[in-house]
């Protein structure tokens, strides 16, 4: 089996194509609320305080803690429906930024929408992990998810790289950029809605049973206690993330305020 040919069933293959098509457009909305993009816009257009820049940089990390909440919300429910709802709410955050004019109120909406979108994105990641575990066998999963993430990464880099030159050339085009992102997000949402999950009925029954009898489900803390390798992995991820949190906010502040650099 090659990296590209996963030898999926016909149903799963259609869903996989829908997911890949969604990754070509949905990041157009999500990238506009990334910490790096929002941080630069907030610093250059709204001249926000350093504390706000720190909040923008830290929001994605702290938003990941909401995964516990989202796993409970999605338990016993259609995973595609939950993911689509969360995607729609992220698009609403993008539209909110496009609608609000510049000024102090605009900076509040921009930062609030960014934080809300990170929490919602954590829910999408949580739900999609269940979709992937059901649709792709263990020997297929890494290849499938790597293809999806590669598409996502390429589109994210292309769009984020285009935003800087566009704002340098047209400084007042922020609203149009976010409207365009919202349209791309709606297209990605429509494509993702075509995904079907194999064996979801049995999974939902199992989740409802575990929700009624929580003592039968192994929690995250219990896994940390019993799985030494996973515990070590999480400790290293925490250390790596801590370093990333420290550097982004000061970097944005130095480049935009002290160096007075352009968007590019």
Residue locations for each model-derived region?
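Helix-to-loop junctions at the C-terminal end of transmembrane segments
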Residues: 66-80, 167
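Helix-loop boundary and gating motifs at the non-cytosolic
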Residues: 2-66, 229-264
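C-terminal ends and interior cores of transmembrane alpha-helices
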Residues: 87-105, 165
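Symmetry-related core transmembrane helices of the 12-TM Major Facilitator Superfamily/SLC fold
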Residues: 175-194
